Amino acid sequence: FTNEKISKLVTALKSSKKEIDRSYESDDWFQWSEGRVSLGKNKSINSSSRDFHSYGISVGADKIKDDDRDAMHGYVFQYANDNVDIGSSGTKLETDAYSFALYDTKLRDDHFFTDALIGISLLDIDQKRVIYGNILEGNREGQQIYGSFNFGKRIVDEDLNLNPGLKLDLGYTKLKAFRERTVVGDSLADALLYKEQNIKSALITLGVLLDKTEKDKEEDEIINHHGRLEYIADLS
């Protein structure tokens, strides 16, 4: 391991694992899960302030390929909720996304690696606008297909490790047409009609990750420094 902390931890685990002997086969699937929560606020002089919060959960499994021990593939189910409050009048936008994706990663010769992910999502969007006390609501459905492809190389040095890479993100989103409805009286003067939308996206990211390890022999400490530099081009 190039990371000294991980190497030290693995050594400790091996020494304490005398009575446990579990050998895994290539047919074994390894389950995993993760969750996330995000909170934020955006204030602007020229537009309404925005408070947003989101949360999500992912459950997946992956396995090492039978015919290639340097490759792994898997799948993941995801649920995400994004909620944005706009201004102080009650206008808000809430999106529920249900996703399924397949992914694959492979370590190649000379520390080259490739990652790929392809997925689909179902979107359920609830919109609420408040105009001079008139409350307008609407529900919109959508479908999405997306893919991400990453190519990189691990450059190992005694003092500094570099990971230059190139990533391509592609997406296609289709949103159904809908019309707002009022919940106050019968006034539809402010109601908007949204036509069907087809949105294409393409991003190219050039970047480099770097990490450096320092040892303090007197204190028996290992300090890791991490950094990232990226350039993102929107080709949409």
Question: For the regions a protein language model found, what residue spans apply to each?
Answer:
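Interface/linker segment at the passenger-translocator junction
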Residues: 1-43
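Membrane translocator/pore-forming domains, dominated by Gram-negative outer-membrane beta-barrels
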Residues: 25-236
